[in-house]
Regions:
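Extracellular/lumenal mature domains of secreted and surface-exposed proteins
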Residues: 1-179
Length: 179
């Protein structure tokens, strides 16, 4: 149990019951936030081999790219913490990192097969054949900004992070020109 008898804890001198400060209640609200895990989507699909020098599209399910809030109320104080996804950093497994400001654009057949994603993509220059399992490990880290307000106060909590990863095989294909 939290000891609110410390200075600045929200307990007034001589009071018989502790009233936590809004910042303390905010910590609890942040701890109780349930952030969705990223669901990685790619084109070509991560179940199939990607080709060297062909653009890879990456995106996250749009349903997870939404604000998440949690309100915690204790006698005398109610605080709401809201987490908003800010960026997705994709470690592509080949030493490159791609930072996307949003969830990315889902690939659709209306796009040319060799077109690059308008906002979240990567082009591999080497095969993954020499990697463990002959695949790169693609790791996405979504950073969430958290703001809270309540009890006449407000504040921010530095980025929370959720992560997901998938293996991605990248193959080389060679064309044979026959005349």
């Amino acid at each position: 149990m939290q000891d609110f008898s410390e200075p600045g804890s929200g307990k007034a001198d001589g009071e018989g019951s502790a009233v936590p400060s809004p910042a303390v209640v905010a910590q609890q609200a942040v701890q109780e936030l349930v952030l969705p895990q990223p669901v990685i989507r790619m084109n070509p699909d991560e179940k199939h081999a990607q080709l060297v020098r062909v653009p890879t599209w990456m995106w996250l399910d749009r349903g997870m790219w939404q604000p998440v809030s949690r309100t915690v109320s204790v006698p005398g104080v109610s605080v709401t913490a809201t987490a908003i996804p800010r960026a997705a950093a994709w470690a592509m497994g080949d030493g490159k990192t791609v930072v996307c400001a949003g969830p990315g654009t889902p690939y659709a057949v209306k796009y040319a097969a060799d077109s690059a994603s308008p906002d979240c993509g990567h082009t591999y220059l080497r095969s993954s054949a020499r990697q463990s399992g002959e695949a790169y490990t693609v790791l996405v880290s979504v950073t969430w900004d958290v703001e809270w307000h309540g009890g006449g106060q407000q504040g921010a909590v530095p980025g929370l992070v959720t992560r997901a990863q998938v293996p991605l095989r990248v193959a080389e294909a060679q064309a044979l020109v026959v005349s």
